[in-house]
Amino acid sequence: MSNPYGFPQYVIDRVMAKRGRLNVFDRFEPRRTALLVIDMQNFYVGEIASVVGIIPNINRIAADVRAKGGRVIWVGMSAGKGGQSDWPIYHDHFFTPEKGANHRDQLSPGHPGHAFHKGLDVKSGDDIVYKNRFSPFIAGASNIDDVLKQSGIDSLIVTGT
């Protein structure tokens, strides 16, 4: 069987035995699909070549999703504001005091680290969602569930860091 994804053959065999076909869907509905671009903020991306190197592909996928009628949602981390942490147990116990403050402050609105990388093609019609935990899907971490439901989105393409 052709394997353009580089999966080991045993994985393909297990998938085929489970559902009888490799792909879950034969096609997708663009208007019910969103591209989620996760944590492509200056704090995480910086000028790390391997991360900056994926930006052209992210922009290309975003343009294709938009052109077909899908949505693009940029998801970023907001760790606090005004010196106050949105997740104090994380900042106070998983870091040294200095590193916890650095993470909190650089991922606060208004700090250059909080901004999405300048190479990303964020459009005015795109959605921007901020989270205060690792995943935007943790209850109370973001409004991503509302954004997806209000837009009729039930299929996701996920990329980023």
Residue positions per predicted region:
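Active-site acidic carboxylates
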Residues: 1-124
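Internal catalytic-core helix/loop-beta-alpha segment
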Residues: 109-157
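Short, well-ordered beta-to-alpha junction loops that form the rim of enzyme active sites
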Residues: 76-78, 132, 161
